Regions:
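Short pre-catalytic strand/loop immediately N-terminal to key active-site residues, enriched for Gly-Thr
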Residues: 238, 242, 258-266
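N-terminal hydrophobic/helix-forming segments and targeting peptides
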Residues: 1-247
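Conserved small/polar residues in nucleotide/adenosyl-binding loops
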Residues: 281-287
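Buried hydrophobic packing segments
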Residues: 91, 273-280
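Alpha-helical transmembrane segments that form the membrane-embedded catalytic/substrate-binding core
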Residues: 266-273
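Short acidic/His/Gly/Ser-rich catalytic and metal-binding motifs that mark active-site loops
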Residues: 248-256
């Protein structure tokens, strides 16, 4: 299944984050409030290039700057003064393939490089296991890639892999992601993180968790309660995360219109969130135990 590529703790190629610093194109970020000052300080030739290309101080706007041989050597990109997380996603969407390195035209100590990298990576997410016409190798080759230090990528890789995993699970149809598939996935996650794994089903489920049993007992793929338990430092508090994993809801007597029924695959979103990002927080959160 597609989600297998996210069962890693290291760099996921799908994120578009790389340590390859060859042929780097500078991605120079400028806040819209700084635009007038910056424009007044530009050389005459750059100022003419800016004006002729109608670069405006709107978040998400970009300007490609070539050298004398018309090769792109830098990109000027405008971000907002506040809440600019998704500005980076919009900027990434407009870039051609290549390796980019972020720098601020004016030093900005308050901006988190991690947040910029996360926004960049989320824009590169693609769910395509059922799209036969899409060449995934071409898609990966065509990614605009953000150059970071390996330590910087590793610090956010678990979170991004968890988010991608959650998205894949929610996007997958109910005939693919069934209770047994969720169990298989959780078992692999537990092994990956050296965590305890437990499943309650059949008679044990009926006796101890009758409501879960009642909801899913008529299904061909039987209901179950899945538990992954991470134990870290005993001096830290316990955290328990519970996610509903109804992989398909018929809507009672199937009274929902067809379009609404298509979205019922998302009824297991709670479990997907518990499995995805939450399953990776144990790497960084100061907790004794996460269940």
């Amino acid at each position: 299944m597609e989600y297998e590529q996210n069962l890693i703790l290291d760099i996921n190629p799908q994120t578009g984050l790389t340590t390859n610093s060859k042929n780097v194109i500078k991605l120079r970020l400028l806040r819209n409030s700084q635009f007038a000052k910056w424009l007044s300080e530009c050389s005459e030739s750059l100022k003419n290039w800016i004006i002729s290309n109608n670069l405006e101080p709107k978040p998400g706007s970009i300007l490609r700057v070539p050298d004398k041989d018309m090769r792109i050597i830098e990109v000027i990109a405008i971000i907002g003064n506040e809440n600019n997380f998704w500005d980076i996603s919009r900027i990434n969407k407009q870039l051609s393939s290549g390796n980019y390195q972020i720098e601020f035209i004016y030093n900005d100590k308050n901006e988190s490089k991690n947040n910029l990298a996360i926004a960049w990576a989320l824009e590169n997410y693609l769910f395509s296991p059922f799209n036969a016409g899409l060449n995934k190798s071409e898609k990966k080759a065509g990614l605009s890639k953000l150059v970071l230090k390996r330590s910087e990528i590793k610090s956010i890789a678990p979170l991004l892999n968890g988010i991608f995993l959650t998205r894949d699970l929610i996007n997958s149809p109910a005939n693919i992601v069934k209770p047994s598939i969720l169990e298989e996935l959780c078992k692999k996650l537990a092994k990956l993180h050296n965590a305890k794994f437990k499943v309650i089903k059949d008679n044990n489920l009926e006796i101890n968790f009758p409501l879960i049993h009642t909801v899913g007992r008529a299904a061909e793929d039987k209901p179950r309660l899945i538990e992954i338990s991470y134990i870290k430092n005993k001096s830290f508090p316990n955290i328990t995360v519970i996610g509903k994993g109804v992989t398909f809801d018929s809507g009672g007597l199937d009274l929902k219109p067809p379009k609404a029924m298509e979205l019922m695959k998302k009824d297991m979103g709670g479990a997907a969130i518990a499995i995805g990002p939450v399953s990776y927080t144990h790497l960084t959160l100061p907790t004794k135990r996460i269940v």
